[in-house]
Amino acid sequence: MKRFISAWNRTSLIKRIAIGVVIGAILGLLIPKITVIGLLGDMFVGGLKAIAPLLVSALVANALSQTREGQQSNMKTIIVLYLFGTFAAALTAVISHYIFPISLKLGAASATKAAAPQGVGEVFKDLMLKMVDNPINALSQANYIGVLVWSVVFGFAMRTASEHTKELLHTLAEVTSQIVRWIINLAPFGILGLVFDTISKNGVGVLADYGVLILVLVGTMTFVALVINPIIAFVMMGKNPFPLVFRCLKDSGITAFFTRSSAANIPVNLQLCEDLGLNPDTYSVSIPLGSTINMAGAAVTINVLTLAAVTTLGIEVDFATAFILSVVSTISACGASGIAGGSLLLVPVACSLFGISNDLAMQVVGVGFIVGVIQDSCETALNSSTDVLFTAVAEKSRWKKS
């Protein structure tokens, strides 16, 4: 038994999740009436639901508190590129939704249609009210918009705090991330339960829906990596960006694909920046910062899953509302890619814009974890490779002007 446990712990999380998916599907076909197996999925989603608001608060506040006033102009350019690139990716995901609308198989609760907001005006009003919610109430009631806003406020306020105070905030973020890592390590069992529950209730045909979801997610991220990012790079540099784009994807993206963590890929990116001959004073700051706030892949994941949930519930979304969704997903993604699967835990933030309950939003998160073996790897590859790309683009743009 000890040998089995040791071998299990040595196996990568990706392989363990894949094993959970296979076993869950087999059990769902063979013994669909043993519903207690689905309890594993309910407990896993419950754990995520419990820690998600605190995770958003801690990571966002910590990330913003670490930014320094008076950064050199090149650093400001990189930050603008990070944020604009993330927003462009979010908008690309919205457009892909209109071209390839997809729906999900959710639980029985989805049979009751969510109250659809009456256009952008109602969405904006609801957004404003959620922003000024009591911060403690926002955490306890999983009001992610309120959590996000207060985290941003506290994060900026903490920029002028003492280093000791910032260290406490950083420690809180680390502790919260560690708890999330413990929960994520239980993902194979939770996903086994989720897949079992899905297959036993909906049959094998539901797997085709997941296949379409994976194609839309990966296709959108590929479009961002090979079309959107090169366009941004060309505008900044004024020359062919593809040699640099492919170098970043090859040397950074491939490694990030397997680590599934932008934070874990920081040493690889720092070495790549050195190989590219970039300014160490710049990339020593921009790469760690990018692993926290440069979230193109996360923005794609959040928007695709949110809009899939919206389609499933029959909610009509105009483009103005979808544009607000892109802004919200860009901001809320701050801090997500430092941990494996972090972007999925931010889907409820975006879902709350459309009046989707936290229970339904967490079902969507569960679907995200089922496809996460591929989604999270591709997302991290896009996020991490873009850190180096935009750092290099900003510096080469300065060289062009000098």
UniProtKB/Swiss-Prot annotation:
UniProt KW Ion transport keyword: no
Transmembrane intervals: 17-37, 44-64, 78-98, 138-158, 179-199, 212-232, 295-315, 336-356
GO molecular function, one term: neutral L-amino acid:sodium symporter activity
UniProt entry tagged with the keyword Cell membrane: yes
Topology of this chain in the membrane: Multi-pass membrane protein
Organism superkingdom: Bacteria
SUPFAM superfamilies, per the entry: Proton glutamate symport protein (SSF118215)
Entry's localization field: Cell membrane
Any one annotated GO CC term: plasma membrane
Pfam family, one: SDF
Reaction(s) catalysed by this chain's protein: L-serine(in) + Na(+)(in) = L-serine(out) + Na(+)(out); L-threonine(in) + Na(+)(in) = L-threonine(out) + Na(+)(out)
Main location: membrane
Coiled coil feature spans: none
Keywords, in A-Z order: Amino-acid transport, Cell membrane, Membrane, Symport, Transmembrane, Transmembrane helix, Transport
InterPro entries cross-referenced by the UniProt entry: Na-dicarboxylate_symporter (IPR001991), Na:dicarbo_symporter_sf (IPR036458), Ser_Thr_transp_SstT (IPR023025)
GO BP term, example: threonine transport
Family: Belongs to the dicarboxylate/amino acid:cation symporter (DAACS) (TC 2.A.23) family.
Primary role: Involved in the import of serine and threonine into the cell, with the concomitant import of sodium (symport system).
Protein's name in the database: Serine/threonine transporter SstT
Source species: Streptococcus thermophilus (strain ATCC BAA-250 / LMG 18311)
Gene it is expressed from: sstT
